[in-house]
């Protein structure tokens, strides 16, 4: 996307490979013209920057933060007691308008707590959600929530759907996103009290709600926004990550098993590299937060320079769309949607939803 924005604030001290990999990713992004401000202990960050040639000529600055949130710290307490920590300072920069968004590979709970504490929520939003972009056969479907709210009520799922629809449309450019709730079957009778209540409400919402989708539909790309509670979403995400790793190892072993397979592997290297890139979580970079008054991205704790660079790029893309302006309007009718009309015309199960089409071959 084009258009100038304020820098993206990057938590230089977040993640297993901080500050080295974080600074490297920020430098890589800055070399491509993306403005970045690194936040952390100034002397340490500048020492790391000095390792990079001509870094002083890049659109990259350093903003001091004297404290760091450790992975074992309690998120809420860390935000309140360590008021000059690098995560909170990143959010302070966003709140003041000096940064267009922030990226952190640090304590994800602290990032969520900091977002709520410093940025606050748009009017009407009950709970923010973490969004994941899935490596589907086509498109870039979103799934939320991925761990922010593990014990959900129907209002949460309804709002996740409405916020996810806005993000898909405004940030990913999907004209009319297809929205579904993750369930154990497509039939109306499937699911739980939670999913059935949310589905009944969403059938009355001004979005393209297509009903339930199953786990097998996650990566087909037939649905643009997949809604679930944070517990289920996180388990599903980790399952997909683990499956991709195991399949990759199986493929590697198979291609090394015989001379013929080794030759076949060499001949198909370009295709295999393309597939590997498609499912590489580092290409996504980070998971955006929706439901807070600012752009925030949570990156994997194992993020390397490539992941951080991509997270910065995606945060910039999101900031340019000003999608947050539409969130409050989108969730405004959510409580009314959950109310059963007095005439009883709309029941909890509602009309039969359209079935999700099988993946195109």
From Swiss-Prot:
It is an enzyme of class 2 (transferase). Pfam families: FA_synthesis (PF02504). Its EC number is 2.3.1.274. One of its GO terms (biological process) is phospholipid biosynthetic process. It catalyses: a fatty acyl-[ACP] + phosphate = an acyl phosphate + holo-[ACP]. Residues 340-361 are annotated as: Disordered. Pathway: Lipid metabolism; phospholipid metabolism. It is found in: Cytoplasm. GO terms for cellular component: cytoplasm. Keywords: Cytoplasm, Lipid biosynthesis, Lipid metabolism, Phospholipid biosynthesis, Phospholipid metabolism, Transferase. Gene3D superfamilies: Isopropylmalate Dehydrogenase. GO terms for molecular function: phosphate:acyl-[acyl carrier protein] acyltransferase activity. Belongs to the PlsX family. Homodimer. Probably interacts with PlsY. Catalyzes the reversible formation of acyl-phosphate (acyl-PO(4)) from acyl-[acyl-carrier-protein] (acyl-ACP). This enzyme utilizes acyl-ACP as fatty acyl donor, but not acyl-CoA. This is Phosphate acyltransferase. It comes from Anaeromyxobacter dehalogenans (strain 2CP-1 / ATCC BAA-258). The lineage of its organism: Bacteria, Pseudomonadati, Myxococcota, Myxococcia, Myxococcales. The gene is plsX.
